[in-house]
């Protein structure tokens, strides 16, 4: 579907110069002289390159719709991750860098959403929140209980998050995968 250059929004997937790009940021600019334009920061979903492009209002670009499919994470094998299609039980192996930093939050049996373009995996979406166990938490400094201060803690997957002072080692908590932040105690 073709869209105008000024209708581009963050999160859009675009076909531009024979590549598939995900829009990271946009900034609409109306200079004093000349026409308005949209400054767009994009990342190539195939090779990971980043670029900044200026689209005028008269420019059109192809917006791509990605197919999405549920997959279940099975196991990690070196730098590769093995997933299974929950409908057909077919297995697929993907490089861990496709997930970026979020790969640390993968858990056995976790259902993820694979975004595909022409039957080719482009990105993996994890659930927004996951449960994890704290393996190491700093001691509470006396007198800090009145303020809303947080202390650093390390999770069982090696990720460091800030938690409230009352959270101790061994506690199961809920973590926001993309913000890497404490959400609450797990049930």
UniProtKB/Swiss-Prot annotation:
- Pfam families for the chain: EFP (PF01132), EFP_N (PF08207), Elong-fact-P_C (PF09285)
GO MF terms, alphabetically ordered: translation elongation factor activity
GO cellular component annotations of the record: cytoplasm
Location within or outside the cell = Cytoplasm
Kindly list the cysteine pairs connected by disulfide bridges: none
Tell me the route in metabolism or biology where this protein functions: Protein biosynthesis; polypeptide chain elongation
InterPro entries reported in the protein's UniProt record: Elong-fact-P_C, NA-bd_OB-fold, Rib_uL2_dom2, Transl_elong_fac_P/YeiP, Transl_elong_KOW-like, Transl_elong_P/YeiP_cen, Transl_elong_P/YeiP_CS, Transl_elongation_fac_P
Q: Which PANTHER family match?
A: ELONGATION FACTOR P, TRANSLATION ELONGATION FACTOR KOW-LIKE DOMAIN-CONTAINING PROTEIN
Q: Which family does it belong to?
A: Belongs to the elongation factor P family.
What task does this protein carry out?
Involved in peptide bond synthesis. Stimulates efficient translation and peptide-bond synthesis on native or reconstituted 70S ribosomes in vitro. Probably functions indirectly by altering the affinity of the ribosome for aminoacyl-tRNA, thus increasing their reactivity as acceptors for peptidyl transferase.
Q: What is this protein called?
A: Elongation factor P
Source organism per UniProt:
Novosphingobium aromaticivorans (strain ATCC 700278 / DSM 12444 / CCUG 56034 / CIP 105152 / NBRC 16084 / F199)
Gene symbol of the encoding locus: efp
């Amino acid at each position: 579907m073709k869209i105008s250059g000024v209708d581009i929004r963050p999160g859009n997937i675009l076909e531009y110069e024979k590549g598939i790009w995900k829009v990271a940021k946009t900034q609409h600019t109306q200079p004093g002289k000349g026409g308005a334009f949209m400054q767009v920061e994009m990342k190539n979903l195939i090779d990971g390159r980043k670029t900044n492009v200026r689209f005028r209002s008269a420019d059109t670009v192809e917006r791509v719709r990605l197919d999405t499919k549920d997959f279940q994470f099975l196991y990690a094998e070196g730098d590769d991750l093995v997933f299974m299609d929950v409908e057909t039980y077919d297995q697929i192996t993907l490089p861990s860098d496709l997930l970026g930093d979020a790969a640390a939050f993968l858990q056995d049996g976790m259902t993820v959403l694979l975004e595909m373009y022409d039957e080719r995996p482009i990105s993996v979406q994890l659930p927004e929140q996951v449960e994890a166990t704290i393996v190491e938490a700093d001691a509470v400094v006396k007198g800090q209980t009145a303020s809303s201060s947080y202390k650093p803690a390390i999770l069982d997957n090696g990720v460091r998050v800030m938690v409230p002072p009352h959270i101790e080692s061994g506690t199961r908590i809920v973590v926001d995968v993309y913000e890497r932040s404490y959400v609450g105690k797990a049930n």
